């Protein structure tokens, strides 16, 4: 509606409104980042974790990583939780596409090359992990000892790079939240991109689900009724065998539901 549009314009990125309300208004430059970052941190708080990590796969020029830093600062203040940020990138742009599954009709090697020195000077808390994700994820947990991974922002474009990034999940599930908030950039596109479940990030997601019994990506269902152009890019990674997966997290909401169904 026009009223909703005006509200978004008036309050966009406002420092005087809580981040949660800005997300509900869709009044943010990168609402999909804010949604995953904020609600993953809120889940962590409900599970009594005092520190979490965000990961961005495919940093490119670095605008998303810088935005994530700003989000983290607000979330740390609003929710009283510590946040670490890690950004994975080759530093040299996209690698050469490996067959049709990497969508060579739309992407080519060398695109989105990073100016590493320039970005290093701009970031404040993020750690850049430079190299082919096929190799850099292997020792990530031993080399960096990150706090539990709460949210992952995946913009690797290719099937091959995306499926290689999923090797991160070969680690113990206790390194993650029991349910990880995930954003996939290249699952909703244009008539030229023509993304499908037979290539790109969607194929990687399907293959992961087919080969893993105890961890599954699931497209969100809670945003589907909303008019959001990013709603089909939000997935949840369920780790069913996580020690905290079955922990009851929201008694206040259940109290409200119980009261609402009471006989009058």
Sequence positions of predicted segments:
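S-adenosylmethionine/decaboxylated-SAM
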Residues: 10, 15-27, 47-264
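Conserved alpha-helix/loop element of class I SAM-dependent methyltransferases that forms part
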Residues: 34-50
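Conserved SAM-binding loop and adjacent beta-strand
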Residues: 25-36
């Amino acid at each position: 509606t026009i009223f909703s549009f005006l509200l978004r314009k008036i309050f966009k990125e406002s420092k005087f409104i809580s981040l949660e309300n800005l997300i509900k208004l869709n009044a943010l430059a990168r609402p999909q980042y804010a949604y995953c970052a904020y609600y993953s941190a809120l889940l962590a708080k409900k599970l009594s974790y005092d520190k979490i990590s965000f990961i961005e796969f495919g940093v490119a020029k670095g605008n998303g990583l810088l935005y994530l830093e700003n989000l983290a600062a607000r979330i740390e203040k609003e929710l009283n939780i510590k946040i670490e940020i890690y950004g994975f990138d080759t530093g040299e742009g996209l690698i050469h596409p490996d067959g049709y599954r990497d969508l060579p009709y739309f992407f080519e090697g060398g695109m989105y090359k990073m100016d590493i020195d320039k970005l290093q000077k701009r970031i404040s808390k993020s750690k850049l992990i430079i190299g082919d994700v096929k190799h850099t994820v292997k020792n990530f947990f031993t080399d960096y000892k990150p706090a539990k991974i709460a949210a992952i922002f995946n913009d690797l474009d290719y099937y091959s790079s995306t499926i290689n990034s999923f090797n991160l999940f070969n680690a113990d599930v206790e390194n993650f939240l029991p349910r990880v908030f995930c954003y996939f950039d290249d699952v909703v596109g244009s008539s030229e991109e023509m993304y499908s479940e037979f290539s790109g990030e969607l194929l990687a997601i399907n293959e992961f689900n087919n080969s893993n019994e105890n961890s599954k990506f699931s497209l969100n269902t809670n945003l589907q009724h909303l008019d959001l152009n990013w709603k089909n890019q939000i997935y949840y990674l369920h780790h069913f065998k996580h020690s905290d997966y079955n922990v009851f997290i929201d008694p206040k909401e259940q109290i409200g539901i119980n009261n609402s169904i009471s006989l009058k």
